[in-house]
Amino acid sequence: MSGWQRIYYKLLNLPLQVLVKSKSIPAEPAQELGLDTSRPVMYVLPYNSKADLLTLRAQCLAHDLPDPLEPLEIDGALLPRYVFIHGGPRVFTYYTPKEESIKLFHDYLDLHRNHPDLDVQMVPVSVMFGRSPGREKGEVNPPLRMLNGIQKFFAVSWLGRDSFVRFSPSVSLRRMADEHGTDKIIAQKLARVARMHFARQRLAAVGPRLPARQDLFNKLLASKAIARAVEDEARSKKISHEKAQQNAIALMEEIAANFSYEMIRLTDRILGFTWNRLYQGINVHNAERVRQLAHDGHEIVYVPCHRSHMDYLLLSYVLYHQGLVPPHIAAGINLNFWPAGPIFRRLGAFFIRRTFKGNKLYSTVFREYLGELFSRGYSVEYFVEGGRSRTGRLLDPKTGTLSMTIQAMLRGGTRPITLVPIYIGYEHVMEVGTYAKELRGATKEKESLPQMVRGLSKLRNLGQGYVNFGEPLPLMTYLNQHVPDWREAIDPIEAVRPSWLTPTVNSIAADLMVRINNAGAANAMNLCCTALLASRQRSLTREQLTQQLECYLALLRNVPYSPDATAPSASASELIDHALQMNKFEVEKDTIGDIIILPREQAVLMTYYRNNIAHMLVMPSLLAALVTQHRHLSRAEVLRHVETLYPFLKAELFLRWEKAELAGVVDALIAEMLRQELIVVDGDVMSLNPSHSRSLQLLAAGARETLQRYAITFWLLSANPAINRSSLEKESRTVAQRLSVLHGINAPEFFDKAVFSTLVLTLRDEGYISDTGDAEPEETLKVYRMLADLITSDVRLTIESVTQDDA
């Protein structure tokens, strides 16, 4: 680069340093994209822009990537390290280098022909200033928005702080040369493929153009399904057609989002400021999956777990900062209060009632609106649990919106729909105190402005946040595998309900819950809470707590729950220091050392965080319980216990393994527990290691309350085989409440109605209860005896005294 060019770029860079604050996607491009900086790297940009080039340069230097302004020297030849696909418009159009990119591609390919050891990594990069999709009427939205110098100046001035540099996976020019040749035609194809790549990338980042709201309503009103529903409304309520149509429009006003890019920008600024003060970090994993789906043209439906009202904002914020379009979000109608409702609506929220029953017009309007979102190509987000979890565990899925998603596919004409499960985790949930009150019987407080202000005023240090993207579920692939003739049900007008729809939706919903849990995130708070709640007095010395966290961490790292699950990289001591900063625990100091205490009033609240990762530790906890209670146990006996109890654990906690996989899981966990010296193995028999009995007992406590719950139900069933399912659920809850009082069990989910409902359903599915409702007394008594050996004698006596008291 000549001296004059250096001066030119330095002068041009001065205003950019002030105006532009760009973000790199991914955050660590070399690491996440597997770039080898020891090999030559060249950058491909969509169009000629020095502002884009200098913005790219700033990110390259910040991430130790080669400087795009430094040319590549190959065998004495100097070649630019960057290529512009389009020359781009200028204020004066007398010069447009149309063939420049093709010539450079050809030069690079030609060098590979002459140098067999050469392998240049070609990295496509898009630099975007602003992401407004524009409106449908009167605007054009080309695949590559090329701006002349003056337009670019205003874009950078206004949108420089809302810019990002998106690095794509590199392409090996060696592979291109070897597989396709090096002539000019290949260079032209390479340029054409690059143009298509950037067009798709822009659509993924910006999304389709937005319709005028009234135009959208007019289109919905003109649909045959809503027109028929309006006629039915007029006839059934004996009102005029105009009045029925007004009712339909009112429902559209109630439901529909009013997406605003300017509101997204403003909220991003506010949230960025807020997150930096409330959170110590937002940890995002596997986002590249979603970026690839968006790039490949999939219709994405985000399906996160629901912990908090914060979920709406956090996920949209994360997606926006991953270079993706924030989705249209299905929000409960309870959030449609001033001023939150109008704000959420402009951020993409569309509102949904708790029930559709008895209102055909509403269900038709909602279904048609959802179908229109899909047909226009907008990403959508909804919470398949239906509401926020009050216990920290996943709730049983509500399948209404999921069913409508599949019905939208049965209309035909939509892009391939892919469901993306998402695990959201927090070290502090602002509503957790309210959840505990509601579980104790308090009436749910209606969402309102005063409640929102009170909640916001209490926000302090929220620790870390976690957003883990799970394994995507492509709907078309799933239907092709499980319902091969599903296309026969396609009807472009009517919402069809083929016989296979309900069982298929239920199966997909259960699969999604498993995939959400597969992406679980262990953190300092839920690990410390798990250990402290496992101790009888909710307190451990710092040394004991450190040892127990080391045990959990080794299990999670060496025998990971799933490939998508994450465990902290920090040491146990560092995690404890971090957890203490959250001000949830008390520390008593004496001459020997620190004692870390979970105060009684905090214990119930902290079960929420323990439950977030209960599924990740329940299997090692069950094995630990077997060893601590039996002292000596053969592998075959362990496997028999596990195979008997696993169906109930799987249904309750949405565990991932099938029965055939259990032997391998058990062997891997036994090997890890042996490595940690928690157990001793002699031939085929495993025994407790007395020198590590405390760690094993604390690990076993993770399954203690679950096993007690199962023991209650199996005892009631064996004592009264003719008991009906409803009575079994009710009596099980009553005994569980009694047990919690007598034995100091502070977990609200211990007597949760939904937990016992799932347990009783699984009893039927596993054949312990016949279709007529009677139990199999021999089988139920056999399982009860197995469970009775795994719980303490005082708890067992309390359970067995119930029927004796009744007698």
UniProtKB/Swiss-Prot annotation:
It is an enzyme of class 2 (transferase). Its main location: membrane. It is found in: Cell inner membrane. It catalyses: sn-glycerol 3-phosphate + an acyl-CoA = a 1-acyl-sn-glycero-3-phosphate + CoA. It comes from the Bacteria. Its EC number is 2.3.1.15. GO terms for molecular function: glycerol-3-phosphate O-acyltransferase activity. GO terms for biological process: CDP-diacylglycerol biosynthetic process; fatty acid metabolic process. A motif (HXXXXD motif) lies at residues 305-310. SUPFAM superfamilies: Glycerol-3-phosphate (1)-acyltransferase (SSF69593). Pathway: Phospholipid metabolism; CDP-diacylglycerol biosynthesis; CDP-diacylglycerol from sn-glycerol 3-phosphate: step 1/3. It is a peripheral membrane protein. Keywords: Acyltransferase, Cell inner membrane, Cell membrane, Lipid biosynthesis, Lipid metabolism, Membrane, Phospholipid biosynthesis, Phospholipid metabolism, Transferase. CDD domains: LPLAT_DHAPAT-like. Pfam families: Acyltransferase, GPAT_C. SMART domains: PlsC. GO terms for cellular component: plasma membrane. The HXXXXD motif is essential for acyltransferase activity and may constitute the binding site for the phosphate moiety of the glycerol-3-phosphate. Belongs to the GPAT/DAPAT family. NCBIfam families: plsB, PRK04974.1. This is Glycerol-3-phosphate acyltransferase. It comes from Klebsiella pneumoniae subsp. pneumoniae (strain ATCC 700721 / MGH 78578).
